[in-house]
């Protein structure tokens, strides 16, 4: 339902990724005057998969893209956790129809590009401004001015920094702080499903856990592609870029001795990309006056729960609700947004970090106890265990 404001609250969003675009779509539908400013000269998303649980898919459905998600995504039937060497399934957690029945929305695996395009399509083109690299903010009390490298400047009632882990908006609010290298490097690849028919893969998310490493694979793009993520521990990341072109042979060497299915998926890739995984400690606050942060700009998390994008989507929906509640008091709205979202996102940051420890246990007594605990059901590692989401 749109608000009939005497003065339509204007909002500038810095960053045209999934979080920024979702925020724009939510706020535009609520009647706000929204513009997105993206530093890239064209909108695109890297070729990688993404998990969208029901906590996020229900929000995306309300934006009118349910049909696109069902057509381009995959609804996996389970989440399987396996041993690295023999492929033994330690735990199979149901997804699919069971999750949708329980939570009222589906669990999707998607190509990031498919989701990104779906969001771009629901935002009027005149609301997306490319080649705008944010450089400075000036808060005048009753409005905020954003300045850009190309010489442009814009004024708005509120400024949302959705510009990722290296957020310039965050830097402007809270000063410089380098993200921490976590000691993990991830190799990502996309493989045509046609190359893997001999493996008999099903629509199930698979995570293989091993000493100091783990390997994840699942279908995307209506089942035509298989996305894989291979994570291993490295002592340092010396390159300035946080993402580089990788080499398939390097991934094969890193996962030497792993199950044949893992190696077959890696071998089928034409190329891989290598990400250094960085994080930051949870912030004590996200907002200052008329400016706040969203997504990785304020709560970057390791991709070990599949909740990074989902939490940015939740941020977007909560931001819309808070601004709708206080449309004429932006400062109060952003303060409420922070109070509602910060504890939840910080909790998930910690849970993602803990999963790194659980996934990467060396073979030994602790690993045997973990496996026995999973097999016995003494600890619930299923999606239902995080129904609080």
Q: How would you describe each model-predicted region?
A:
Residues 2-11, 53-192, 235-254, 384-389:
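Conserved N-terminal helical subregion
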Residues 10, 33, 225-228:
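Residues at the starts of beta-strands that form the adenosine-phosphate
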Residues 12-41, 160-161, 187, 217, ...:
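Conserved mid-domain beta->alpha element of the FAD-binding
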Residues 42-58:
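Conserved N-terminal glycine-rich FAD pyrophosphate-binding loop of Rossmann-like flavoproteins
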Residues 71-72, 127, 256-274, 330-335:
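Acidic/histidine metal-binding catalytic segments
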Residues 181-183, 200-204, 248, 260-276:
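A short coil-to-beta-strand element that immediately follows conserved catalytic motifs
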Residues 203-238, 248, 252-256, 277:
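Active-site substrate-recognition segment that forms the wall
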Residues 370-389:
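Tryptophan-rich aromatic "cage" segments
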């Amino acid at each position: 339902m749109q608000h009939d404001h005497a003065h339509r609250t204007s909002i500038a969003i810095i960053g045209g990724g999934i979080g920024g675009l979702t925020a724009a779509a939510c706020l535009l539908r609520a009647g706000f005057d929204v513009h997105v400013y993206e530093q890239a000269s064209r909108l695109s998303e890297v070729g990688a998969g993404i998990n969208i649980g029901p906590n996020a898919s229900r929000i995306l459905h309300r934006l009118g893209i349910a049909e696109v998600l069902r057509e381009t995504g995959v609804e996996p039937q389970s989440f399987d956790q396996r041993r690295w060497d023999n492929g033994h399934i330690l735990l199979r957690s149901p997804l699919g129809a069971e999750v949708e029945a329980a939570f009222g929305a589906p669990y999707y695996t998607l190509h990031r590009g498919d989701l990104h395009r779906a969001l771009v399509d629901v935002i009027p083109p005149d609301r997306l401004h490319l080649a705008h690299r944010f450089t400075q903010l000036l808060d005048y009390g009753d409005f905020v001015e954003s300045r850009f490298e190309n010489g442009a400047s814009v004024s708005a009632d509120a400024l949302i920094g959705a510009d990722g882990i290296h957020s310039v908006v965050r830097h402007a609010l809270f000063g410089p702080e380098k993200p921490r290298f976590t000691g993990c490097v991830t190799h990502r690849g996309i493989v045509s499903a046609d190359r893997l028919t001999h493996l008999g893969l099903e629509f199930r998310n698979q995570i293989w856990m091993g000493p100091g490493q783990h390997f994840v694979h699942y279908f995307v793009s209506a089942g035509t592609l298989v996305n894989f993520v291979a994570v291993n521990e490295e002592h340092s990341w010396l390159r300035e870029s946080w993402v580089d072109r990788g080499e398939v042979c390097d991934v094969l060497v890193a996962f030497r001795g792993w199950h044949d299915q893992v190696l077959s998926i890696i071998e089928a890739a034409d190329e891989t990309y290598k990400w250094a995984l960085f994080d930051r400690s949870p912030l004590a606050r996200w907002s200052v006056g008329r400016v706040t942060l969203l997504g990785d700009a304020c709560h970057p998390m390791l991709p070990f729960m599949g909740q990074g994008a989902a939490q940015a989507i939740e941020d977007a929906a909560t931001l819309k609700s808070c601004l709708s509640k206080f449309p004429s008091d932006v400062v109060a709205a952003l303060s409420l947004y922070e109070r509602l979202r910060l504890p939840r996102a910080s909790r998930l940051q910690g849970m993602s970090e803990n999963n790194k420890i659980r996934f990467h246990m060396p073979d030994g007594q602790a690993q045997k106890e973990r496996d026995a605990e999973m097999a016995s059901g003494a600890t619930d590692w299923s999606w239902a265990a995080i129904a609080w989401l």
